[in-house]
Amino acid sequence: MKYNRNALYINVLPFARYFRQRFAPLSATGGGRKATTTELHKQKTVYTNRVRRLAVRSDNMKTDRVITAMIEYFGSDKKRIHHFLKVYSFAKTIGESENLLPDDQELLEISAIVHDIGIKVSEEKYNSSAGKYQELEGPHEAEKLLAALGYEKTFIDKVCYLVGHHHTYGNIDTLPYRILVEADFLVNLYEDDSSRSAAEQAYDKIFRTNTGKNLLKIMFLIP
C-alpha cells in the first residue's frame, strides 16, 4: 500500500478485537466450552473475508481519487477520459488474471489511469499528441498530480517511469510495464478501427501475457 496506509489498519482493528473476544471463550479450557474445529474454521473464514473486503474497499477508494483527479485534469475532453478509463479497466483485468503481486498491481493500475496525462501539455506546446511528446511531458504532470494526492516519492518515480516509456516497446522489462502496453494496444487498436492484420502484428510483436493475447484474439477474431 502506497497511500493512506494507516486507514486500513484502523478499520481492521474492530474486527481484530471481535475475533479475539469471540474465540477466547470458545477456545478456553476452563469455564467456556472448547470450540470444535468446524466452528473455529467458520469464524476464521468470516473474519478473513471481512478483512479482505476492507482491503479491497480501501484500494478502490484510493483508485477512485486518482480517477476523479484525472477526470478533473482532462475536463471536457471526453475522448481522453474514456480512453484512460478503458486502458485502466483492461490493465486491471490482465494484472489480476496474471496474478501480479499487490504492489505491482497497484503500480499498474495507477500508471494506467495517468498514462496519457502528458497528452494535454503535448497538444498545447507542440500541437501534437505523438507518443514521444507524451513520454516527454507526462512524467512531470503525473508527479504533480500524484504528489498532491499524497503518494510517496518512490512510488511516484515508478509510475513516472512507466508514463515516460509507455510508447517505447524495445526494452519492456517488468510485468506492469508489459501489461500497461498491452492494455493501451487493446484500446488503441479498437479506437483506431484497426484491421485484423494490424492486430495480428501486435499479437506477434507486442503481446506476451496469456491474458492479453487471449483478449486480443477474441476481440479481433485472430485464429
Regions found by a protein language model. Name each.
Residues 7-12, 16, 24, 28, ...:
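Short hydrophobic alpha-helical segments enriched in small aliphatic residues
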Residues 20-34, 53-55:
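Short Gly/Ser/Thr- and charged-rich N-terminal loops/segments
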Residues 42-60:
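Short, Lys/Arg-enriched N-terminal segments with co-localized hydrophobic residues
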Residues 63-86, 118-128:
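Active-site flanking loop/helix segments enriched in acidic
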Residues 72-101, 114, 151, 166-223:
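Divalent metal-dependent phosphate-bond-processing catalytic cores, especially two-metal-ion Mg2+/Mn2+ enzymes
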Residues 87, 132-148:
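An active-site-proximal "capping" alpha-helix that borders the catalytic cofactor pocket
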Residues 105-124, 138, 160-167:
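His-Asp-centered metal-binding catalytic motifs of divalent-metal-dependent phosphohydrolases/nucleases
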